[in-house]
Swiss-Prot record:
UniProt cross-references to PANTHER family, sorted A to Z: ACTIN
Gene for this chain: ACT1
One Pfam family recorded for the sequence: Actin
Organism whose genome encodes this protein: Plasmodium falciparum (isolate NF54)
GO terms of molecular function: ATP binding; hydrolase activity; structural constituent of cytoskeleton
Protein name, UniProt field: Actin-1
Length: 376
């Protein structure tokens, strides 16, 4: 490669959405659902070209006649054939870039199994012939995008939540906590409590409607019990939502009962600790000398931290748990839905990062296990 730096492609593979674009941009060019849809009844789709699978938005718009599958569950790839379809769609249809001409930066969940990183590496070099690639931990990228190298990231997306303490740019694996409770669980919980109100949402297509209701109307109460009392006495918190068929439904205390499950997982029948306790426990697992830096830099990341009131409530609940002299600061960047991608864009355009790429030569020499030596 000459002196001219070829732009890298940055792909953040989330359980819910793929965020993809070009290094150096300040936002992803393409955001689409991580879905592969296949016809329920092959052969009866009149006027549609015989495609065996649809990816992303196209799968979303034809969802009535398709079975939708998410190849990434709880942040980790479980179906590699579908994942390859998603990557193919990302490069050729969304970014319209030839992967063999660009280095590719991919993201992974914290504590991603070793075999998974190797598989990602193998597919990039062997199926897509990339010249170079790198796999970065999602939470670390979010921290970079907030302009920090030390802090604790609470990253909550569609499939999984993690608290990841990071010191001088390195994640501390022994203190990472994983919570299998995220956006998809909240969508399912909202379906359930709307059912109790008499609104029956059940199909995979209707689930997408409920996800939209959740994103538009839900918020986090500063004090849940008070909010419940208030909602019983007045109808101020009721909001209406228009369904695709024109019917209008009313959503009341479901608006804050749904995301409350982040703080009280028992609502979902889970025994886990809430996000406030998980963050606190993660910090407690770190060396006593760095805790002050972590408490003062709690950085939110991911779509499930976007509810109004998240930052305030987290500050209040962690302050209650932490030593009384400790200064607690929760940082909620406005672009946190995309902060993993933005961090990847920043990292892969740094001149100092250019020697970090795994090159095709290195891969050919060492095989997929090279990823453990070069990406950490």
């Amino acid at each position: 490669m000459g002196e001219e730096v070829v732009q890298a492609l940055v792909v953040d593979n989330g359980s819910g959405n793929v965020k993809a674009g070009v290094a150096g941009d300040d936002a992803p060019r393409s955001v689409f659902p991580s879905i592969v849809g296949r016809p329920k009844n092959p052969g009866i789709m009149v006027g549609m070209e015989e495609k065996d699978a649809f990816v992303g938005d196209e799968a979303q718009t034809k969802r009535g006649i398709l079975t939708l599958k998410y190849p990434i569950e709880h942040g980790i790839v479980t179906n590699w054939d579908d994942m390859e379809k998603i990557w193919h769609h990302t490069f050729y249809n969304e970014l319209r870039a030839a992967p063999e001409e660009h280095p590719v930066l991919l993201t992974e969940a914290p504590l991603n199994p070793k075999g998974n990183r190797e598989r990602m590496t193998q597919i990039m070099f062997e199926s897509f012939n990339v010249p170079a690639m790198y796999v970065a931990i999602q939470a670390v990228l979010s921290l970079y995008s907030s302009g920090r190298t030390t802090g604790i990231v609470l990253d909550s997306g569609d499939g999984v939540s993690h608290t990841v303490p990071i010191y001088e740019g390195y994640a501390l694996p022994h203190a990472i906590m994983r919570l299998d409770l995220a956006g998809r669980d909240l969508t399912e919980y909202l379906m359930k409590i709307l059912h109790e109100r008499g609104y029956g949402f059940s199909t995979s297509a209707e689930k997408e409607i409920v996800r939209d209701i959740k994103e538009k109307l839900c918020y986090i109460a500063l004090n849940f019990d008070e909010e419940m009392k208030t909602s019983e006495q007045s109808s101020d918190i009721e909001k209406s939502y228009e369904l695709p068929d024109g019917n209008i439904i009313t959503v009341g205390n479901e608006r804050f009962r749904c995301p409350e499950a982040l703080f009280q997982p028992s609502f979902l029948g889970k025994e886990a600790a809430g996000i406030h306790t998980t963050t606190f426990n993660s910090i407690k697992k770190c060396d006593v000398d760095i805790r002050k830096d972590l408490y003062g830099n709690i950085v939110l990341s991911g779509g499930t931290t976007m509810y109004e009131g998240t930052g305030e409530r987290l500050t209040r609940d962690i302050t209650t748990l932490a030593p009384s002299t400790m200064k607690i600061k929760v940082v909620a960047p406005p672009e946190r839905k995309y902060s993993v991608w933005i961090g990847g864009s920043i990292l892969s355009s740094l001149s100092t990062f250019q020697q970090m790429w795994i090159t095709k030569e290195e891969y050919d020499e060492s095989g997929p296990s090279i990823v453990h030596r070069k990406c950490f």
